[in-house]
């Protein structure tokens, strides 16, 4: 009985180490030493969003995917900007 429990323990340890090494590394690694400024991050994100909106897609009448994307962007923009105070 002791051999079975020892074998199961070794198998469990082996499986756990294999699971840790099989996990893919994160695509984006953020340094902990870099302090993130929330105001600066918001400006960067808004700048990237503005750059994305600069590219205007011309959708044809038959391009249903394009129309769906534009509708989704419009709804998302409305949802996230309706509470902002406009100057």
Curated annotation (Swiss-Prot):
Residues 1-22 form the signal peptide. GO terms for molecular function: growth factor activity. The modification Sulfotyrosine is found at residues 78, 80. Keywords: Developmental protein, Differentiation, Growth factor, Secreted, Signal, Sulfation. One of its GO terms (cellular component) is extracellular region. It is found in: Secreted. One of its GO terms (biological process) is cell differentiation. Induction: Up-regulated by fungal infection. Expressed in stems, roots and leaves. Its main location: secreted. Sulfation is important for activity and for the binding to a putative membrane receptor. PSK-beta is an enzymatic derivative of PSK-alpha. InterPro entries: Phytosulfokine. Residues 23-77, 83-87 form a propeptide. The keyword Electron transport does not apply. Promotes plant cell differentiation, organogenesis and somatic embryogenesis as well as cell proliferation. Belongs to the phytosulfokine family. This is Phytosulfokines 2.
């Amino acid at each position: 009985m002791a051999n079975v429990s020892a074998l199961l323990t070794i198998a469990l340890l082996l499986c756990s180490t294999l699971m840790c090494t099989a996990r893919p590394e994160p695509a984006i690694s953020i340094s902990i030493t870099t302090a993130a400024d929330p105001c600066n991050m918001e400006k960067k994100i808004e700048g990237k969003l503005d750059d994305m909106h600069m590219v205007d897609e011309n959708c044809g009448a038959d391009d249903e995917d394009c129309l769906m994307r534009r509708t989704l962007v419009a709804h998302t923009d409305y949802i996230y900007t309706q509470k902002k105070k406009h100057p």
